[in-house]
């Protein structure tokens, strides 16, 4: 038996969990680093639920722990592992791994929202104050107060309790607390947070009375302005004292102790006032009272500072939640401008506590006026709106402020419109508006994404006190919030306007398509004539000679070409297999014919018909139909007939150079895409739906093949793809079983049929070449006249003597190798190759003849010289 070596023993120990745990305990730096790098959210949450949630931890302890963790993280070798040049993040994703409240919540009605109910947070009740006079008990009361301060952030409740504590020391009859505030002009004033706190008074009683005092006026205003305490023995002997409050309340003020409350920057944030010393020292406050009052007010300063930070964070959180809700609303509703404006107005009214919200939409056609005005009042929030009532209300709206803001592109904040001299209320500008209805006003422009154009104006009227409902001025916070709010309003309005514009464009398009489809469809008389003729007799394919690769249409009338097309559909079993109605097929054929332009020399109905005839011959005589599905056969014949629909007699290059609107629709194969779109329009026009017998999947498959086949007639795509096909043929690797190879073959077959005029008997080929040249020369003339450019030789009427040599070059570069490859796939398509070779010989002979004539002409000219 072999003995275990030292390495084996060490390996077994390392696999022992107890040994691993002991090692981790001995290497705490590594353990901490490993936990920081590897711990998951679930692990941290489990640790919290097991250890933290059941242990009450004071905030100071948590703060100290956080600071120690921060230090450890900074000292950890893994803490600073950022790549040089990487952007620094203000907040790490790991900071969000601790358990937080859900971002998205549902309200009582089940509606998803970003707004949470912050009023439901549980707080420990404040401990009742103790009024012992013993110094040890005073210390206990201070500790008790510190405990309350550390766990509560309600400034009103805490300051109320502080005053009750103070009462046990200085024994005043009444206490009041005033906080420093700023209006929209940044002018300071004082608002009572607690007023007339007395022994036995409740928090609700003390906080209900709200009084506003002017800065540097009265005793409280003076203390706030200068930051120095005042101890007044007889208030009525001090000229700064305002006796109006006594006259209103019936209370007699005698002695006053008034002290400032400062923050850590020594700025006055509030003023505390004690009135009427109740016992001792002749009813006046002593120096000891001042010291005790100042000591406790230091706690008030801490409370105010913490509470202001907390309230600011709550306000910012609430703001962000409202803005998130508004963003969600904007992206949720984009169909109706009226609906989205109603939701925006309701959100603004509810959050900002205003009486009225009016949103003006600027008229794009007439920038000096508004196209729409949406008005909502606080009573309408949550109720269905009546359009008639809203129109009547719109007549009572004053446009003066909105017009001013639109022109200046700057916000407007008016504390009291009746005192603003910029906008005098006269009969001319007042209209039907009742002046007393408007007190304070805030008006902000709504700009577009580029910030250089006003698309609307948001006007708020009468900000209300939450408790009393009294009208007050809008402050700077309101301005900032509305400024952020209108950014989302602008997005919503722009998105909705774009949606409405798209809807109007789509409606116009539908009407246009309806008109086009009516004019694109064949006339009923012509359809009935073809239907009657084809019902009587349609000659056989042999009689019509449409199975011959040498077929010529020159002797046929347009009606006879339509009969030939019906025969093609019939002999390919397409009518029977896809339940085509005879009337619909006749109308579709004549509609296709109608949508080829008669003023185009070559790319007209006759070219489309000849392409379809060559496709029919390849399928039947070339025996290619046996290797295709019925859907592929159907798609190829439709594509052959439709592949040049609405051809304008110019190529893609001309369309691009002339900056034709078609060039903006497609990035490549411009005309081919247009041909397919026209094909689709006819197939979907009423009375032309020959594919109505197909299932949905069959219909999609057929359209896909039709599109691929029509796009394949772009010679640029043919040149790009032919190398792959020729290589498969050369290596004898082509197979119809491979879907990609089959798709490639269908594309090559479409090109072969499109160019089949080059394979016709010489008299036919020569006549067609003249038609092609006429069309090309017309394009060259347009290039010279409209684009001021010299056309290529192929398009140049002055170079028509080069047609034979150019035809030889075209056959060698484009045609010959294609028909050779097609013959390898189906030997029955050999007539196409033979015809191409014979015509090459003819063109070559003409080219040589032209060259001799040119040489003879030069020789004769030389002899004359």
UniProtKB/Swiss-Prot annotation:
Sites binding Mg(2+) sit at 644
Which stretches make up the PDEase domain?
A: 526-850
**GAF domain: residues covered:** 154-304, 336-493
PTM info = Phosphorylation is regulated by binding of cGMP to the two allosteric sites. Phosphorylation by PRKG1 leads to its activation.
The cofactors it requires, by name, are: Zn(2+); Mg(2+)
Q: Where does Zn(2+) bind?
A: 607, 643-644, 754
Q: GO terms for molecular function, please?
A: 3',5'-cyclic-GMP phosphodiesterase activity; 3',5'-cyclic-nucleotide phosphodiesterase activity; cGMP binding; cyclic-nucleotide phosphodiesterase activity; metal ion binding
InterPro entries linked? GAF, GAF-like_dom_sf, HD/PDEase_dom, PDEase, PDEase_catalytic_dom, PDEase_catalytic_dom_sf, PDEase_CS
Cite the active-site annotation.
603
A biological process from GO: positive regulation of G protein-coupled receptor signaling pathway
Q: Which reaction is catalysed here?
A: 3',5'-cyclic GMP + H2O = GMP + H(+)
Q: What does this protein do?
A: Plays a role in signal transduction by regulating the intracellular concentration of cyclic nucleotides. This phosphodiesterase catalyzes the specific hydrolysis of cGMP to 5'-GMP. Specifically regulates nitric-oxide-generated cGMP.
Q: What is this protein called?
A: cGMP-specific 3',5'-cyclic phosphodiesterase
Q: Which gene encodes it?
A: Pde5a
